[in-house]
């Protein structure tokens, strides 16, 4: 399973959401949740308080057990949910979580903030230091 962690506190730099209008991050979470629900459990969507990418909000993290993880920013909640879902599906389909770069949606290619390796299945003192 691939998990989308969505920052629900994200807001645009010039944005001052009112009580009547939810923050853009919360709107993105709602859009992604609706889209993922139609996929039958392939993708889980989880709200988080902050992904520390405030200058490039809205932000999501895409991860899966034993797979590479990605942080993607500069997402528009009204436009980019389909691209995030498409990327999450590619991530889900690849055993290592490394979808081919050219197959990723353009917005994801241009706005990937970080790619994080999976945790080793067992850490030894050697593997923690990188020594051989």
Question: Where would I find each of the regions flagged by the language model?
Answer:
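Short flanking/linker segments adjacent to small metal-binding domains or redox-active Cys/His motifs
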Residues: 55-56, 61-67, 88-132
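Immediate flanking context of iron-sulfur cluster ligation sites
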Residues: 1-5, 29, 33-53
